């Protein structure tokens, strides 16, 4: 292995000089010969034997002149069943203090996406047990879903509930990549999995907020590589990424440090390419499927920001969380008019489901239009049909709320899993006027429609 010396350190970016006949390739992993043993990844070759690298760990204590050795290959991480139930960092090292990972097999984190011929599609629906999602933006097995929302509208709680419902109901493997999120949430999530007895089916990879940008930029690839291994063995895998925006943000930090000119809103000029490299690998092949659920932070609640806008293009279903709905106390704060799914098609989900979903959206849209009239003139000025529609819309709006299992400790209400059949029956009944006689508060924070009828008796 060739070795070189550090010649310049600027934050997380380190320039290393090698002999001209043994310059490391792009994406090679380099090891600094110091007590910390920091790993570097080659990003650019500057000429004269100098390479510009990005550090995967802290650069504290490094100095010019330290020896650096070239590993001769890209960063590789352990893959396979030995990773289940473990927490690892970006380099695949265990950070849960439970001993080394018992596998010899390691895969490089930079891999080509499956070719066109290898890819496979499908229309099998994935039931989540969350009414609003199953109704208006159904997920598909092997599809990609984005949870879009600003700060504090419930992306992580929704993600946790989806993990709980799908990982427990679905018997396959899951990989969770924590990209630039709070360590506290990572810790809560670990204990949540442990208490639900599904930890032995989940591999956890964390590169949290306190890590340098190089680490946060690569940790999503580490998680994805582990998921690809399970897929190639013929499994149906769930890949959860929280948060994909921090992946973009880490790319922005790295890009600026590497001296690239920023593009729109200060993002890196390679934004679309970086996102494409990651997203094109998250796909299903003829061997197995990867169903991916990604949380997407929306800066300043602006969905046209380049980062969320670039993510939209890659998704099959988008779940948009709205601050206005959260402020009404309706959780999950999913906006049924903004959220979309490619599966919302009568040929895929069936005519009854399609008509019910579109009926719900029509009623809520009409209510939105009538709100201005109600605010100025009051309810009395509306026609009888509009009054009836407004009453049904308010019931639908409340019935879209649901108590979550993962939020039991905060709300004190026990969580509810609602099957798709019950969800469709409930909303269809409200649209048909079967429950016009029930008060609207009976529909708030309940599971199925039977529970709403029971609640109405007590009011």
Swiss-Prot record:
Record key words, sorted: ATP synthesis, ATP-binding, Cell inner membrane, Cell membrane, CF(1), Hydrogen ion transport, Ion transport, Membrane, Nucleotide-binding, Translocase, Transport
Enzyme Commission number(s): 7.1.2.2
PROSITE patterns assigned: ATPASE_ALPHA_BETA
Membrane topology: Peripheral membrane protein
Domain of life: Bacteria
Enzyme class: translocase
Record flagged with keyword Transport: yes
Reaction(s) the record says it catalyses: ATP + H2O + 4 H(+)(in) = ADP + phosphate + 5 H(+)(out)
SUPFAM superfamilies reported in the protein's UniProt record: C-terminal domain of alpha and beta subunits of F1 ATP synthase, N-terminal domain of alpha and beta subunits of F1 ATP synthase, P-loop containing nucleoside triphosphate hydrolases
Subcellular location as annotated: Cell inner membrane
Pfam families: ATP-synt_ab, ATP-synt_ab_N, ATP-synt_VA_C
Purpose: Produces ATP from ADP in the presence of a proton gradient across the membrane. The catalytic sites are hosted primarily by the beta subunits.
UniProt protein name: ATP synthase subunit beta
Gene that produces this protein: atpD
